[in-house]
Amino acid sequence: MIPAYVPNSAAALFGGGTPIDLGRTFSDGRRVFGDGKTYRGFFGGVVSGVLVGLIEIWAATAFSLSALPQQTFLSVTLLATGALLGDLAKSFLKRRLGKDRGESWFLADQYDLVVGSFLLILIFDPQWLFGTITLPIAVWIVVMTPLLHRVVNIIGYYIGVKEVPW
């Protein structure tokens, strides 16, 4: 899951520039995603997640770290991309519900990356998903994701990368 946890933070670091929705509005008159979702942030986040995943693959082999999941280039790419696609889907829904950029949305803010990652990997690499994500790992993901999300966002807020600490 590490390749899925990295992209959101990296997107905040690399963000800025052209919004993915190019400033367009949806049929409800609201922005599709908003200014917070940019091409630079999206691709910077995905590349960062993939690079961390490749380091994980190398470390697992080089240091015989059997506790790490058996990752592949495909799995780390799907996890990283799915995390940010989940974030985009959440932003789309937030705009439809009239929520502002940065406004907290309990549970959706914490689990969008998990849902996006798992959905993408379920579609393109279900063998990896069912062979790697056991019940104890799934429980760990459900419990730890909101905690990690909160800690990382607080750090991002204090170093000036995020406008709000959630």
Curated annotation (Swiss-Prot):
As cofactor, the record names: Mg(2+)
Top-level taxonomic group: Archaea
* Pathway where it operates: Membrane lipid metabolism; glycerophospholipid metabolism
- Which principal EC class is assigned to this enzyme? transferase
In terms of InterPro entries, this protein maps to: CarS, CarS_archaea
Protein name in UniProt = CDP-archaeol synthase
According to the UniProt entry, its GO molecular function terms are:
CDP-2,3-bis-(O-geranylgeranyl)-sn-glycerol synthase activity
Q: Which UniProt keywords apply?
A: Cell membrane, Lipid biosynthesis, Lipid metabolism, Magnesium, Membrane, Phospholipid biosynthesis, Phospholipid metabolism, Transferase, Transmembrane, Transmembrane helix
Report the protein's function.
Answer: Catalyzes the formation of CDP-2,3-bis-(O-geranylgeranyl)-sn-glycerol (CDP-archaeol) from 2,3-bis-(O-geranylgeranyl)-sn-glycerol 1-phosphate (DGGGP) and CTP. This reaction is the third ether-bond-formation step in the biosynthesis of archaeal membrane lipids.
Q: What reaction is this protein's catalytic activity?
A: 2,3-bis-O-(geranylgeranyl)-sn-glycerol 1-phosphate + CTP + H(+) = CDP-2,3-bis-O-(geranylgeranyl)-sn-glycerol + diphosphate
Membership in a protein family:
Belongs to the CDP-archaeol synthase family.
| NCBIfam families per record | PRK04032.1 (NF003114)
What Gene Ontology terms describe where this protein resides (cellular component)? plasma membrane
**What is one process in the GO biological process aspect for this record?**
glycerophospholipid biosynthetic process
What's its EC?
2.7.7.67
Q: Which HAMAP family does the entry mention?
A: CDP_archaeol_synth (MF_01117)
List the transmembrane segments: 42-62, 73-93, 104-124, 128-148
Quote the subcellular location field of this record. Cell membrane
Q: What is its main location?
A: membrane
In the bilayer, the protein is annotated as: Multi-pass membrane protein
